[in-house]
Curated annotation (Swiss-Prot):
GO terms for biological process: translation. GO terms for molecular function: structural constituent of ribosome. One of its GO terms (cellular component) is ribonucleoprotein complex. Belongs to the universal ribosomal protein uL16 family. This is Large ribosomal subunit protein uL16. NCBIfam families: PRK04199.1-3, PRK04199.1-4. CDD domains: Ribosomal_L16_L10e (cd01433). Keywords: Ribonucleoprotein, Ribosomal protein. PROSITE patterns: RIBOSOMAL_L10E (PS01257). Pfam families: Ribosomal_L16 (PF00252). Gene3D superfamilies: Ribosomal protein L10e/L16.
Length: 166
């Protein structure tokens, strides 16, 4: 089956569905790491990526943003000059009621009978002005870190802004 478009899951329409003990099975998390870079050093500058609207960010989008950001930071700043942290965790389980399509689908399909849906992935529920990613670095690399955060924000389903703190 084809993955549904992200706009179906973007809005916070229903309450959080995260009690996994009642679910048959939930697909694994795509986000591999939540902390990257130099974890031992204390950096003076913090740069945050803040979501401007309430939304749900799918774990696949978070992983795409993480890969993009980490790659840009590794190339421009270097492994030892930053600490990247993902601050939102995808707890919410997304469900999908599979529909048969194509020739003869009406004979195979059950319609809306048992339409609760099966778990297809997870998402992080983000509030307005919540910080999703944070990069700590030195003052000389602030522009490169801002650029990396901004470009990874294009992968997320909400408008974002970059905030610099000393």
């Amino acid at each position: 089956m084809v993955r549904k478009p992200a706009r179906m899951y973007r809005n916070l329409a229903k309450k959080a569905y995260c009690r996994r003990e009642y679910m048959g099975g939930v697909p694994g998390l795509k986000v591999v790491q939540f902390d990257m870079g130099n974890l031992s050093e204390d950096f003076p500058v913090a740069i945050h990526l803040e979501a401007l609207e309430a939304c749900q960010i799918r774990h696949t989008a978070m992983e795409a943003a993480r890969i993009n950001m980490n790659r840009r930071l590794m190339k421009t700043v270097g492994r030892n000059n930053f600490h990247l942290k993902i601050r939102a965790y995808p707890h919410h389980v997304l469900r999908e009621h599979k529909q048969a399509t194509g020739a003869g689908a009406d004979r195979v399909s059950e319609g809306m009978r048992l339409a609760f849906g099966k778990a297809v992935g997870t998402a992080a529920r983000v509030a307005p002005r919540q910080r999703v990613f944070t990069v700590w670095t030195t003052p000389q690399y602030v522009d490169q870190a801002k650029d990396a955060l901004l470009h990874s924000g294009y992968k997320l389903p909400t408008p974002v802004r970059v905030i610099v703190e000393n």
